[in-house]
From Swiss-Prot:
InterPro entries: DUF1328. This is UPF0391 membrane protein Bcep18194_C7021. Belongs to the UPF0391 family. Its main location: membrane. Keywords: Cell membrane, Membrane, Transmembrane, Transmembrane helix.
Length: 53
């Protein structure tokens, strides 16, 4: 349990560095691009799963 607390604390520190620095806008753009890529991958795998039945 303590291990997870330390991991989430480190993630929070990294997020704070990006959020309070000037990098937030660039990271948001990258996140948007990755979101759409993963939505497309999800839809493709969903369709492949339906077709294989």
């Amino acid at each position: 349990m303590l291990r997870y607390a330390v991991i989430f604390f480190i993630i929070a520190i990294v997020a704070a560095v990006f959020g309070f620095g000037g990098i937030a806008a660039g990271a948001a753009e990258i996140a948007k691009i990755l979101f759409y890529i993963f939505v497309v991958i999800f839809l493709v795998t969903l369709l492949l799963g339906v077709v294989r039945r």
